[in-house]
Each structure stands twice: as C-alpha cells, then as structure tokens.
C-alpha cells in the first residue's frame, strides 16, 4: 500500500478527491511513467515508491488505466498474505512471505509472525495447522484508499452520463469533440504528452 499524489489536480476525473491517498499495488506489475507517456497516455496519479497508479488515453477520457488495485476491500491484501503463508507452509516457498508493505501495523505484524512460528511448530510436530488469524488481524487493518476510489468511479460515471449520446448508435452527445470530450485541450488544461 503506497502513498500517491495527484499529478493533474484539475482533471475532471479527479474532481474533489484527496490530493494524497494510498493505493495497494501488485508487487509483480510495473509500467513506468516513461512507458505510459511514450504510449501517449497522461499520468494522473503516481507514487514515488509504487509508481504510476492511474493514467488516461490521449483524449483524457475514453480509456482509463489503473496499475494499482483501488477495488480492493480492507481484507483483500490479508487474503493474499494468507495464501502466501500457506504456500510457504506447503513447501512452495522457501521462506515466509514478507508482510504487505504499509498495510500491517506493528502489532498486526507481530500477530502474523507469531502465527507463522506456531504453524511451523505444528508442522514439525505433525499436528494440524492452527486456524489463520483473520478475526484477530482484521480489526487492526485500515482501508486508506476506498473512499478515493469510489469518488473517481463516481466522477467517471457522471462524465459518461454527461457526454454519452442517448442514441446508442452514437458515441457522444452532439457538439462533443471525440478527440477532446472534456475540452481539456481547448482550455489549455491538458498536460503535455
């Protein structure tokens, strides 16, 4: 879970959201700012540590790209961590998985570490594994991204409603420029790509 900053604060998709917020990222995915920009996309939200979270197509609207996981619930990362712990206990991994970054409090980390030690001991003694500690860890977890994610989706839905033609054969309302539907280029508000 990484702290992010809005790079284009006046973009309509980012209207009335926090200028700094957290977002979970996959540890296996990274498309750099340079790669996004070389593809003609505009980076809207990014993190020094986690990289780009959100970018849009050159028209600023038609295609929206999320590299983070704004859709995650509070316990989504906990479920992924649990999966990795059990992969370790089943011998698929050679060491216990790291905690999800910036997600577990110090206390939650100690609880998780203690569980791994107890599970390792149970395996050595040929006993059943103890139940994973979701009930104990869950209340210690914070969701620091959900409200912002909902606001972005709501902004997008509002723009779709405002711009889309009622005639399903036509993409936009009459008078909407398909290359600049948000009029960002016309207003000089479009960041250079």
Regions found by a protein language model. Give the residues of each.
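Amide-donor transfer/coupling interface in amidating biosynthetic enzymes
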Residues: 5-193
């Amino acid at each position: 879970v990484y702290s992010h900053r809005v790079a284009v604060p006046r973009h309509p998709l980012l209207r009335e959201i926090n200028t700094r917020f957290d977002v979970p990222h996959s540890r296996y995915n990274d498309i750099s700012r340079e790669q996004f920009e070389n593809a003609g996309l505009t980076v809207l939200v990014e993190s020094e540590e986690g990289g780009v979270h959100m970018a849009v197509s050159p028209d600023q609207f038609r295609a929206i790209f999320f590299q983070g996981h704004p859709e995650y619930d509070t316990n989504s990362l906990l479920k992924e961590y649990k999966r990795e712990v059990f992969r370790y206990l089943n011998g698929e991994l050679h060491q216990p998985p790291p905690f999800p970054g910036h997600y577990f409090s110090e206390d939650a980390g100690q609880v998780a570490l203690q569980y791994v030690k107890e599970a390792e001991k149970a395996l050595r003694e040929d006993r059943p594994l103890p139940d994973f500690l979701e009930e104990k860890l869950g209340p210690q977890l914070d969701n620091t991204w959900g409200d912002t994610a909902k606001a972005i989706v709501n902004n997008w839905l509002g723009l779709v409603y405002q711009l889309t033609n009622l005639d399903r054969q036509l993409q936009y309302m009459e008078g909407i420029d398909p290359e600049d539907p948000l009029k960002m280029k016309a207003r000089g508000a479009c960041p250079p790509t």
